[in-house]
Amino acid sequence: MLHLIGLGLSHETDITVRGLETIKKCKRVYLEAYTSILMAAEKETLEKFYGKELILADREMVEQASDDILAGAQEDDIAFLVVGDPFGATTHTDLVIRARELGIKYQTIHNASVMNAVGACGLQLYNFGQTVSLVFFTDSWKPDSFYDKIHENRKIGLHTLVLLDIKVKEQSIENIMRGRNVFEPPRYMSIEQAASQLLEIEESRDEKVYCSDTPAIAVSRLGSPRQCIKAGSLGELAEYESGEPLHSLIVLGNNVHDLEIDFLVEFADDPEAFKALITKDAENFKKEVKIMSYSDDDDE
């Protein structure tokens, strides 16, 4: 059987009791090592705590050699460990589909992930819309599909969780072209880079989806003892020093609940100024929606 086991967000002890008991009985244990990291535990720490040797599963192994992971799973117990919750990435869904095709049974042992723990900032989970991912921009590649999803969310008053890029065991274009098996150092997108990239796309698209005054929340090292939450404008967060990874960014919707505001202001340097930002943002967004509506009527 294939066991997909969530590890939680930070510490080796974040694993559930059922997850730990399952690991101990497995013949092989894989640790997925490219969609996220445990902030307070290295591979060796996990091995000592679990009493098991871990096999690192990078992107290439999971996406191109999944049959190697699943080998023998018809007869033996195989564990696949994922930081956060097992179904936080589509890659893990693909692994389950392949297991089904091979007639392999599987079970999932869930755990906390950024998708639910983000409520620690005070925003109500059912007030979130589509989650988006933000990748590192290059000089020639600046994908902006996230922009339209943020727009859709804000039009109906919903917040947007922005998941920030992680580069682990990535190769440069030069090394790929030369066939050199050399990998770049790990990179983790910071809050300030994420906010700057969002504003860069707004400047180029100019559809007034958000601006430097749009209220946002920086969530750093969620679930760890060094967790930090910062409330401010996108412009302020573009100059924020967010520190060590991991980070997520939230763009607020234009209809923030009073209870959410009461919770959020505790994370702002100037609570009254942050409240004013929220009020101003709601008013400005409604004006933009009205203008766009009139423009659509004229086109007809």
UniProtKB/Swiss-Prot annotation:
Cell compartments where the protein resides: Cytoplasm
Pathway(s): Protein modification; peptidyl-diphthamide biosynthesis
GO terms for biological process, alphabetical: methylation; protein histidyl modification to diphthamide
Catalytic activity: 2-[(3S)-amino-3-carboxypropyl]-L-histidyl-[translation elongation factor 2] + 4 S-adenosyl-L-methionine = diphthine methyl ester-[translation elongation factor 2] + 4 S-adenosyl-L-homocysteine + 3 H(+)
GO cellular component, one term: cytoplasm
Keyword S-adenosyl-L-methionine on entry: yes
Residues holding S-adenosyl-L-methionine: L9, D85, G88, S113, V114, L164, L222, H247
Top EC category: transferase
EC number: 2.1.1.314
Pfam families: TP_methylase
PANTHER family assigned to the protein according to its UniProt record, in alphabetical order: DIPHTHINE METHYL ESTER SYNTHASE (PTHR10882:SF0), DIPHTHINE SYNTHASE (PTHR10882)
Family: Belongs to the diphthine synthase family.
Function according to Swiss-Prot or TrEMBL: S-adenosyl-L-methionine-dependent methyltransferase that catalyzes four methylations of the modified target histidine residue in translation elongation factor 2 (EF-2), to form an intermediate called diphthine methyl ester. The four successive methylation reactions represent the second step of diphthamide biosynthesis.
Name by which UniProt lists this protein: Diphthine methyl ester synthase
